[in-house]
Amino acid sequence: MENRKTFSWLKEQMIRSISVSIMIYVITRTSISNAYPIFAQQGYENPREATGRIVCANCHLANKPVDIEVPQAVLPDTVFEAVLRIPYDMQLKQVLANGKKGGLNVGAVLILPEGFELAPPDRISPELKEKIGNLSFQSYRPNKKNILVIGPVPGKKYSEIVFPILSPDPATKKDVHFLKYPIYVGGNRGRGQIYPDGSKSNNTVYNATSTGIVKKILRKEKGGYEISIVDASDGRQVIDIIPPGPELLFSEGESIKLDQPLTSNPNVGGFGQGDAEIVLQDPLRVQGLLFFFASVILAQVFLVLKKKQFEKVQLYEMNF
């Protein structure tokens, strides 16, 4: 009898352990599915393809604008701001992974020239820290400090993201030169439509996989639909699964064609990319330019003085 009780207790503990493990896995998987910069980091060695396209566009299919603002020129070993703006209507709600509606998150990738990197905390001024807020930036790869990623973060609070950047010093980094450099940026608002494995998220349109009649629509207990489509020609039945989130456009008994949308498009977000240019300025050139301007001003002053002196001489000769 005691053996049975012991066995029953062990069985109960095993079931609990398995349940807890499954819950941890689901929670972890959900958080990863929302952390879209991770997809690019895991799947691509470089976030910018040879064509110039940033890989985030592979999952975020809608095209939306972004704006990048950087100084025209910076001096070596100087901290400056790179400001990314991701505009969108703050009243919009997106479909979450569970099918409910919620606010949009934003994320970004900033591709700097070689040698430029995230400014260390001790080099960031209090004013700049206030602009950054509670954002936490990370390098795309340990060996790619010039590529920074951020997100997902709440869009209502961080539709404008300020990156603190440290410019390189050619005196200590021999592979860096005083030149004009390009900066590339990509930013998205909202969840993607496709996962890296090619599967669809619930934030996109679902199309019919067969032509026929919608025979039955079964609403699932946890949300979503199971749609039975019967081919009128041969009676073959196809079942399309719709996850929670998208709204159905068809009712039972209606005809439908292959690839015709079964649902509305719930996506309200999108991805955009842009670029800018920045000059790593040589301080000696700046000093030379200032010296040139000063010499021009002095020359003008001496010219005016000489002219007045000449006029006085002419006036004296006329009076004489």
Curated annotation (Swiss-Prot):
Instruction: Name one matching Pfam family.
Output: Apocytochr_F_N
What's the domain of life for this entry? Eukaryota
Cofactor binding mode and count: Binds 1 heme group covalently.
What is the stated purpose of this protein?
Component of the cytochrome b6-f complex, which mediates electron transfer between photosystem II (PSII) and photosystem I (PSI), cyclic electron flow around PSI, and state transitions.
In this entry, which stretches build a coiled coil? Answer: none
Biological classification of the source: Eukaryota, Viridiplantae, Streptophyta, Embryophyta, Tracheophyta
Question: Which InterPro entries does UniProt cross-reference here?
Answer: Cyt-f_TM, Cyt_f, Cyt_f_lg_dom, Cyt_f_lg_dom_sf, Rudment_hybrid_motif
Q: Which cofactor does it need?
A: heme
| Swiss-Prot/TrEMBL keywords | Chloroplast, Electron transport, Heme, Iron, Membrane, Metal-binding, Photosynthesis, Plastid, Signal, Thylakoid, Transmembrane, Transmembrane helix, Transport
- Provide the protein name: Cytochrome f
Which segment of the chain is annotated as a signal peptide?
1-35
> Membrane topology per the record?
Single-pass membrane protein
Does the entry feature the keyword Lipoprotein, yes or no?
no
